[in-house]
Structures are given as C-alpha cells and as structure tokens.
Amino acid sequence: TQANDPANVDSIRHAKLLYISGGDQNRFMDAVAGSAIEKAIHEAYRNGAMVGGTSAGAAVMSAVMITGNARKKTGYSSTFNTIETDNIETRPGLGMLTKSIVDQHFVKRSRHNRLISAVLEYPKLKGIGIDESTAILVKGKDAEVVGNSQVLVYSNTKRSKKFVKSGKLGARKMMLDI
C-alpha cells in the first residue's frame, strides 16, 4: 500500500512541513493507522518538522479523535442536539496532541454539544474547538490563535462527569476560554 511505500515514507520522514488536508478523518486514519507513514509523521515531528492540518486534518492531530458520528442517532448531522452519555464516537488519531481533543468548523457549525460531550466523556482532556479560517499554532505547552475567527477551549476543571436523568451528561465548574 502507499502507506507503507518506502519512497513515501522516506519523503515524509525527512519533510520539514507536513500538511494534512481536509476530507474525512476516519478515511485518513483508516489509511495510515499502524502504518510506516504514521511512524514517519511522528519521526518528522520529533526531528523538528511543523505538522498541521485543516478540517479533518486538524481533527486527526488528537490522540482521542472525534469521528463525527453519533452513536445514538442515525444519519449524519454536523451538530449534536444533546449532551448525553455514550453518544460521541471516538477513535485513536495521530496523537500529536495528547492532552486535548480537537473539533473543527466549530463556531460556524455549532459543534458545542459535541465537544462538551467529548470533554465530559474524557475528563482529563481539554476540548479545542477551531472555527473555519482559523488555526492554533502549538509549540510545546504554548498555543497561539491565528486567523479570522475564534478558538474555544473547554476544560473540565473538576475532571468529573455527572450523569443526569435520561442519560444526559452534566458537570460543574467547566471552564471556557475564547
């Protein structure tokens, strides 16, 4: 496969800039998970390469990646109507960001419920909602917002998840930074 082709792997391993385009984050991870390409991306990053992505390419940066699918609702919707337990489908991403979950097209597509649900399901992780035409530049523990819109960061400060009646999720003292 192309994900294990030595020429592709070598090209990525020695790259100074890797940019992962949009599309479907699940298809990307299906193609690269466990492959030599995935290892080469991490090696390039450790060697100082800048790794970035847009849309699905931003979503794959997380260790815990939102797939975009709801477990309890059939059919695709860009937003989630409720904040409830076991509704957010996740899978392993590239793991470039190990302490946060990234969601994309955030403000434009009103994905607050989806990211809040993910942060409640994974209370040790921050939720980073990146809007369209906007990016975060992460260097070590610092992040800078650039672009035309906003980045919202949800933190579950008590690192707890509370089940409310009917399978809904709740929490106290969540923090929002814009």
Q: At which residue positions do the language-model features occur?
A:
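Catalytic-core regions built around general acid/base machinery
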Residues: 11-14, 35-48
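Glycine/Thr-rich phosphate-binding loops of Rossmann-like dinucleotide-binding domains
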Residues: 28, 62, 69
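Catalytic nucleophile loop
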Residues: 21-22, 45-65
